[in-house]
Amino acid sequence: MGIVVQKFGGTSVANEESRARLVAKVIEARHDGKDVVVVVSAMGRKPAPYATDTLLDLVGSVCLTAPPRERDAIAACGETISTVVVAAALEAAGCPAVSLTGGQAGISTDSNYTDARITKIEPRRILEVLSDGKVAVVAGFQGVTERGDVTTLGRGGSDTTAAALGATLGAEIVEIYTDVEGVMTADPRVVPEARFQDTMSYTDLIEMANQGAKVVHLRAVEIAMHSRIPLAIKSTFSDSPGTLVADVAPRAVATFAPPRVVSAVTTVAERTQLVLQGDLYSDTGSVLGVFSTLADQRISVDMINVFPDRIAFIVASREAAAAVETLKELGIDAETNPGCAKVSVVGEGMRGVPGVMARVARALHDAAVRVLQTSDSHYSISCLVPESDMERAARALHAQFELGK
């Protein structure tokens, strides 16, 4: 029998009603003749008692500077609890299941606590469970080091667990179940005209994740792409087929229409622009020093523009004060421009196509949106705009590239 990996997020395991829907999805796959590996996240979101942030607060209330190793040890408890609850729910429905922690499932990681990388997976225990005719319910988001210490994989780590298990087990597909019915052309809270996409490429989903879309974790999509494992993004709460992510999006009928240049618009709010004045460009060491020092402080930098007389980039607004202080220690004064947002158009189809930037500029100009900064790659164009203009900018770009049709 083929193997299917099904990952269920926090809202899918949060209460009895959602867990009943989860159980139905698993039983349906088994009725289709599949061996099923279930990956689960912690139950619900803060202030739910077993949500990751709630558990971390237990440590934070005792020691604000708790070592990362200890934070990982308690953060991983949420997923471990979920595995037992879900396995019990499956058993109660007549579907035999075994709960496994990340370590029991054979997931090994490096020692980068709170943001560990999977180094290898030994799936022997999972395969034993499947060969016994049972469902393996695996804790997402966690693994163990060579010394046996528990680690976590960073936010979105359960997606990574599911993709890595799918690749290791040679799964037919990895199904990511969430509270939305698939990948949309934009955040519907920002662009009401956004629509669901039936199919899309790995490249487009990776670029969406790079530009801030919180659909599937970036590492998970990269693993799936490199392993050529299809991903299906579905809702636990509906029977919609969701969005299929694969090498070549299959179509029910032949089509001779040109591919879309842009497949989605993404938005990221609460950004602060930092501008460093001076002739830093002539001193490569100074430029490298700025960004390496910020990286050492774990401050993420985006939209970097280097000019002869200045450097401009953005950081999350919550990290702006720390970034300014770090730069002061280097003897560099930073001009800050808070209250910004990044709006991006994403699409594998734009590579090598002339005029995309012109269309972006025209749409934003016509919408009276002030552009503070731009950056681009082969598959995306990003514009920094005042946060107050973010929705207007996103809607203008969505309309410009006819993504609602």
Residue map of PLM features:
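Terminal amphipathic helices with adjacent charged low-complexity linkers/tails
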Residues: 41-56, 233-252, 308
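Nucleotide/pyrophosphate-binding catalytic subdomain
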Residues: 1-221, 384-386, 401
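Phosphate/diphosphate-binding glycine-rich loops and adjacent basic-rich segments that engage nucleotide
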Residues: 139, 192-197, 207-268
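Glycine-rich beta-alpha junction loops
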Residues: 43-44, 180-182, 227-231, 235-240, ...
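Short hydrophobic alpha-helical runs that function as membrane-insertion/retention elements
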Residues: 173-177, 231-233, 302
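A conserved regulatory-domain signal marking ACT and ACT-like small-molecule sensing domains
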Residues: 242-405
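Electropositive, surface-exposed helix/loop patches at the edges of structured domains
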Residues: 130-145, 208-232, 277-278, 284, ...
